[in-house]
Design a protein with these regions (language model features):
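A short beta-strand-turn-helix
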Residues: 33-53
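Conserved redox-active cysteine motifs that mediate thiol-disulfide chemistry
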Residues: 57-74
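Short, internal strand/loop/helix patches
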Residues: 103-138
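Hydrophobic beta-strand anchors of alpha/beta hydrolase catalytic cores
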Residues: 54-55, 86, 133
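Short pre-active-site segment immediately N-terminal to redox-active cysteine/selenocysteine motifs
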Residues: 51-53, 58-61, 129
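Thiol-based oxidoreductase modules, predominantly thioredoxin-like and allied folds used
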Residues: 83-97, 109-118
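N-proximal helix/coil linker or "cap" segments that precede and/or mark the start of modular domains
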Residues: 5, 9-31, 48, 170-173, ...
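Thiol-/selenol-based redox modules, centered on thioredoxin-like
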Residues: 135-181
Length: 181
């Protein structure tokens, strides 16, 4: 009887230890504040509350970044009602910020643009090449990363967005069908 009790305790403790290893290895959005292009400080984790967030890292010299951002803006507008949003993080120097503001305004982007001029957040999230995309869930847990951009990548990215928000979309359709009756 005592032996069975010890085995149960061992299994319980092993399960706890294994579970904590899994949790510790999970990647999260860093708990930091960045300034937006109007110099207002924003906490990254607060942006994730109730949303899937696609963080897009870019700079003005990156032409593939600019091509990708057109699609990201479409995704931001198309899926925002499904608790999905795009947050763009620019990595140009502070002295280039007037050019960044002009570009964002002339492109009519509807997503929020933050600044990471020292590339600290970019590096913390594992970035090495631009454009760099990180998708996080509402807890700030990183669920996907994508490096670079080639024409057609936006299709795979949109499929990933649809997959992540599919539960929300399905329940919305069910609610709509109930209301039609």
């Amino acid at each position: 009887m005592c032996q069975v009790y010890r085995v149960k305790i061992y299994l319980f403790i092993s399960t706890l230890l294994f579970s904590s290893d899994v949790i510790e290895n999970k990647e999260f959005i860093p708990d930091v504040r960045l300034k937006d292009i109007n110099k207002k400080k924003v906490k990254l984790l607060d942006l994730c509350k109730d949303y899937y967030v696609l963080f897009n890292f870019w700079n003005m010299a990156c032409e593939p970044c600019k091509k990708e951002m057109k699609f990201l803006n479409q995704f931001h507008e198309k899926y925002n009602s499904y608790n999905f949003k795009v947050i763009s993080i620019n990595m140009d120097s502070p002295r280039s910020m007037s050019k960044v503001k002009k570009y964002v305004k002339s492109s009519k982007y509807s997503f929020e643009v933050l600044q990471d001029p020292r590339m600290d957040v970019f590096k913390k999230m594992g970035g090495s090449i631009m454009p760099f995309v990180v998708i996080a869930d509402s807890s700030g847990s990183i669920v996907n990363k994508h490096i670079g951009y080639n024409l057609g990548d936006e299709k795979a990215l949109e499929e990933e967005i649809k997959r992540l928000i599919s539960f929300k979309i399905d329940t919305t359709k069910i609610d709509a069908m109930k209301n039609d009756k």
